[in-house]
Amino acid sequence: GDLLPEAACIVNPNVGGCDFPSKALAGCGVMFYVLMALRTELRNRGVFDRTTQPRLDKLSDLVALGTVADVVQLDHNNRVLVAQGLNRVRRGLACPGINALFEVTGRDPANATARDFAFGIAPRINAAGRLTEMGIGIECLLTDDPVTAQELAQELDSLNRERRELEDTMQLDANALVSHMDWEHRATVTLFEPDWHQGVVGLVASRVKEKINRPVIAFAPDDEEGLLKGSGRSIEGIHLRDALDHVSKMRPDIIERFGGHAMA
């Protein structure tokens, strides 16, 4: 809603009064600019100079991957972030985790594209968070040891295969649900099955959205009894997060918490 949490500092390009031109930053992009501002401040205070300051360009591959994986709008600023990161990958300077993930996907980092991030690397990192523990993906991206990175990348690849099998089963369920509803005359579509996995509903929503060109939210039972956890995907012209914000204000008893951006 419009109520901001109590905090010493809130960094969000969408907060009222913020003149930062790019309003579609992913969280990793926000953090990258925070680090840049912090580096500038520390340099001005004499903590280091331009020759001894931390090299933030070493993070550009991670920023690019996070920007693509978060499916944010690729405005000019985000395109610059992605291009810089891809350039680092192509020059063989990516972190061991990204290099290992390129290897397990059979893709060539020397010719890396945003599609490699979106359809090769990101699904394997996300598979850990969807099915078990996101920490596996984080550890893979943070390790400096190529051997450890390779082992973790293999584990992520295995989890992704498991995720695909689960997604295929849930997609059959979703297709059956859609076939029995008059979706052509609906502004939005919501789907639910009691045995769906909450970590995969976003993928199901995305596929159905592409098929019927409607905003779709898919739900699964939450770990907390009595609640459902959903994930949505929207279409051009309908800002999903703003729509959920409107619903939460009209019916605060329906939505426990939510987040996201225009398209997801």
Walk through the language-model features, giving the residues of each.
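Short alpha-helices
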Residues: 5-47, 59-66, 260-261
